[in-house]
């Protein structure tokens, strides 16, 4: 089922529900199949990273996680 999404990558949105309610940010990614978006600076999670050539020590990074598209509203510029 194809759904026409009103929110696109690069749009400025405001979070209307959840822990980050009231925050605004730019949309970094849109996932139409799961109806989720990734908003800059919202829904930050701490993720473990295994040691690799890029990151020899491993450790933790803070990463934006996808949130439901119904939890954000487009902001007029």
Swiss-Prot record:
- What are the entry keywords? Ribonucleoprotein, Ribosomal protein, RNA-binding, rRNA-binding
Q: Name one GO molecular function term.
A: structural constituent of ribosome
Q: Which GO terms describe its biological process?
A: translation
Keyword RNA-binding in record: yes
The record ties this protein, via SUPFAM superfamilies, to: Translation proteins SH3-like domain
Pfam families in UniProt: KOW, ribosomal_L24
Q: List, alphabetically, the InterPro entries matched.
A: KOW, Rib_uL2_dom2, Ribosomal_uL24, Ribosomal_uL24_CS, Ribosomal_uL24_KOW, Translation_prot_SH3-like_sf
Q: Which PROSITE patterns does its entry note?
A: RIBOSOMAL_L24
**CDD domains annotated for this entry?**
KOW_RPL26 (cd06089)
Tell me which GO cellular component terms the UniProt record holds: ribonucleoprotein complex; ribosome
**Family assignment from sequence similarity:** Belongs to the universal ribosomal protein uL24 family.
* Quaternary structure and interacting proteins, as annotated: Part of the 50S ribosomal subunit.
What functional role does this protein have? One of two assembly initiator proteins, it binds directly to the 5'-end of the 23S rRNA, where it nucleates assembly of the 50S subunit.
Protein name, UniProt field = Large ribosomal subunit protein uL24
Organism, per UniProt? Campylobacter jejuni subsp. doylei (strain ATCC BAA-1458 / RM4099 / 269.97)
């Amino acid at each position: 089922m194809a759904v026409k999404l009103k929110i696109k990558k690069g749009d400025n949105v405001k979070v209307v529900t959840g822990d980050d309610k009231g925050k605004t940010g730019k949309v970094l990614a849109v996932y139409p199949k799961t109806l989720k978006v990734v908003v800059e600076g919202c829904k930050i999670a701490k993720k473990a990273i295994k040691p690799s050539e890029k990151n020899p020590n491993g450790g933790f990074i803070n990463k934006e996680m996808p949130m439901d598209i119904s939890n954000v509203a487009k902001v007029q510029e």
